[in-house]
Amino acid sequence: MRPDTSSLDRWFSVPQPRPAAPMQLFCLPWAGAGAGAFQGWAAAAGPGLEVLPVVLPGREGRFSEPFGIDIGELADAVSARADRPYAIYGHSMGGRLGFEVIRELTRRGEPLPLRLYLGGCRPPDHVEPLAELSEVSDEELLGRLIELGGLPEELLAEPELCELLLPVLRADFTWLHEYVYQPGPPIEVPIEAFAGADDKSISVEAMRGWARHTSAGFTLSVEPGGHFFLRERRDHILDRVRA
């Protein structure tokens, strides 16, 4: 069922609507993050691309909603908002979400994206080591994410912020922990993947495993930086989307 306009709007943060842009880019964040992870992308994209960061339940404008990720509902929202050719970029957990959304849209026979862009994301048939963070202490969870570069070390001095962030982190890592890949045909959407050369959570070789999950072509670029290379490589990624 397609969401109505009011419920559809809550799914997206669109700082610069571009209804005349010939293409849309839906952006899915990593665990614990929200649409704010893609701050500045809309301005950098230029007039030819409308950037739509996704707002997942339990955070940002949906703070009062229960945590939880439902692929069917996410696919409903993307399908309803995609009113022209579009692509999906997913980083880390967001890449797995994007892949499952495409599989759901395929099952429904709905229009598929032109391309799936993935950053720092383990293939769906691989065990995700970070999923174990759903079961560790708060201190270990925050410490591991600081080590990866996903959180600033200064956050530890802000207990109120930690209190707000921890439930989001735990909900997302629980989704990753409970995720079970269901074997199926490769998607009929090209995959363009980006790997951080110094990523401590996933190797470049592991990311090559995405090649077997598409029948429409696969490319992999190795970017300077760690797991969150997209912060410095945003413009390069957008160049690839617009190419």
Task: State each model region's role.
Residues 1-89, 93-243:
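Domain-scale detector for complete catalytic domains at protein termini or as standalone homologs
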